[in-house]
Amino acid sequence: MMDDDTELRTDGNSLLKAVWLGRLRLTRLLLEGGAYINESNDKGETALMVACITKHVDQQSISKSKMVKYLLDNRADPNIQDKSGKTALIHACIRRAGGEVVSLLLENGADPSLEDRTGASALVYAINADDKDALKHLLDACKAKGKEVIIITTDKSSSGTKTTKQYLNVPPSPKVEDRHSPPLCASPSDIELKALGLDSPLTEKEDDFFSLQAGHPSSCNTSKAVNEPGSPTRKVSNLKRARLPQLKRLQSEPWGLIAPSVLAASTRQDETHGASTDNEVIKSISDISFPKRGPLSRTNSIDSKDPTLFHTVTEQVLKIPVSSAPASWKAAYEKGQAPHPRLARRGTLPVDQEKCGMGPSGPSALKEPASLKWLENDLYDLDIQPGPDPPNSISLESGKGPLDRKKLNSSHLSLFHGSRESLDTVPSTSPSSARRRPPHLLERRGSGTLLLDRISHTRPGFLPPLNVNLNPPIPDIRSSSKPSCSLASGLKSMVPVAPSSPKRVDLRSKKKLLRRHSMQIEQMKQLSDFEEIMT
């Protein structure tokens, strides 16, 4: 800031000195003589700034407003800042130059928003100087430029503390006593969410949606789970919380309501209960769907130590030698041949394969119609009559009587065995007739794979009745040298084969009905083709 020492202020600048003394004629002569109007001293102060700062008054000096007006008319820049960042407008507000000087500066382009190095603008300095005229001109200038001015002043209350007041279109801050103190620290479990139901009144306040409960939340969760229409998962969780032991709640830690170990134990109990419930449901379903069966002599019927017993049908077909039979009948015939030994119990699997041939006969063996009525009795007679077993089959247990065997032979199994044994007498002199299907072969039936022996489960099929001769000679176990019959071999490929028995000759002449567990589409087509050939 300049002082009264003109020599120090002007630094030999005649223009600044003439302005400082308020000599209008001298200033005009200097400017007309070529002096630079925006020239500054070592502090960066220009002639316009000096005119706003000076307070020198004598008989030859003029007023500040006239000097400022003359300098502005000669294109003095009002927005030049000195080294401290202050403009001529800021200096006029600090020195309280008056409203007229401020108005002249604003009319000639002075910017009231420019700030100095401390971040204060002309508005701040006008407020601090308590110059109401200058402040009024500044506010009018800001509004004219479309700027909204907010003035913030500090005041001291009666207690000596500073308070803040706001003006100009800004709502005042609420008083301290009007502010609601925040509620006590609450955990998420303390907050009860209520949905507006259909039966609730329309005049219910919004404050009721979120309510804080002062007591322990775990003690009332059971009642909330019963009353509110929440989701099933939420009800289960609330009931689980109700069953847990009450823990002491700390004032400093409102969130630790339940220990993790208690939650883990409760979760394990719920899982065990859920698993037991599932087991009960499965057990009840199994009791309804699956009837109990009689006792079996061997429980693990599929446990075989010989892995070679289970061959696929394709492997068996590849082992059959080539014969003179036609290709179409031969492939299906070779696929359907297999030996079937007598089994002592249902649920057992033969270990060795039976090797026996087919006796000679003609196509006239299929002449008599079959009947479903006598099949069950025939199978029962086969099981109870004593006689030698096939060479490589499992023998009957000697300790079991006829009544025990009757229990083990159910009606739905006898239908299948009767239909299979009734076809053992169909002749074939082809060299491939010496090999028949082993009992352990698997065949696709319906939607699953079943064993083609007495452990397989059968249902009455829908095959048309065929004519069968029930009095053929005993099958010869040696290979036959007679020429093969294409018709008989074709019949064997389309009809399932039953296990052979040496007691077949002693059976009474009865009508047999050929049955199959289930039929595939290809086999049904072959049967229809065979019926056309027979007709």
From Swiss-Prot:
The keyword Phosphoprotein applies. The modification Phosphoserine is found at S301, S447. Residues 159-181, 214-237, 381-444 are annotated as: Disordered. Signal peptide: none annotated. SMART domains: ANK (SM00248). Residues 216-225 have a biased composition (Polar residues). Keywords: ANK repeat, Phosphoprotein, Repeat. One of its GO terms (cellular component) is pi-body. It comes from the Eukaryota. PROSITE patterns: ANK_REP_REGION, ANK_REPEAT. InterPro entries: AN34A/B/C, Ankyrin_rpt, Ankyrin_rpt-contain_sf. ANK repeats lie at residues 10-39, 43-80, 84-114, 118-147. SUPFAM superfamilies: Ankyrin repeat. Belongs to the ANKRD34 family. This is Ankyrin repeat domain-containing protein 34C.
